[in-house]
């Protein structure tokens, strides 16, 4: 039986700022609150668990959504403090914020935009796993063709990369589900599962917001393509396919505990 690790980088929406649009935290939070609730609706309808990597900003400005995430059985992990301006001190501060808001211990970290992190600092602060690696070659973003494809240890911290296909290392993250034909994406996921025994992917709340209805965001086509309710449907069909094939959905912390036994 193979394992599915769904994850969501639960951050304030800031993509328009990358394209020169002045965008406030309040506006970004509105988009991300709605998107996160839509994600939770899909997960609840399918009865599956996931891991939500939350920024400190999101946790402090959407405590009611954080509560829903926990009430519905999902794991909360850390994703920095301010998604737009990550800092070296975020490892400790984001953990403090998220644990204060949730009242629960946090075990995992993912750096905004999957940028590199200090493994010694991750360990020092008390995280047991780090999921900040996309082992693919995407010019201008990720240059990790020689990095391990599957989980590995660095000291006491388990590294859990996002899944890429065997051999050619095609990334199986959010943009791929937006833009590939669904049948091809599902085929690549199943091939990866047969090879690795588990599958890790990640999405963002703002993908589930109706981006096409907001030209003022100046979003590139590959990002707004199949966004909003179309993305809800794509996620729903992906989950149903994976369940029908007998896979088990688990949180990252549960996966770490299982692997370490």
Residue ranges and their predicted role:
Residues 36-40, 63-67, 91-95, 119, ...:
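Generic structural signal for well-ordered alpha-helices
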Residues 9, 43, 79, 109, ...:
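Conserved, mostly hydrophobic/aromatic
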Residues 1-72:
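Active-site beta->alpha N-cap acidic-glycine motif
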Residues 44-47, 182-261:
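C-terminal domain-boundary segment and adjacent tail
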Residues 16, 99-100, 104-202:
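Active-site-adjacent pocket scaffolds in enzyme catalytic domains
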Residues 24-30, 54-55, 80-85, 106-107, ...:
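The substrate-binding groove and active-site-proximal loops of carbohydrate-active enzymes
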Residues 14-16, 60-62, 85, 116-120, ...:
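Short catalytic/ligand-binding loop motif for oxyanion handling, primarily in non-cytosolic enzymes
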Residues 46-118, 127-128, 132-133, 158, ...:
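Metal-dependent polysaccharide deacetylase catalytic core of the NodB/CE4 family, i.e.
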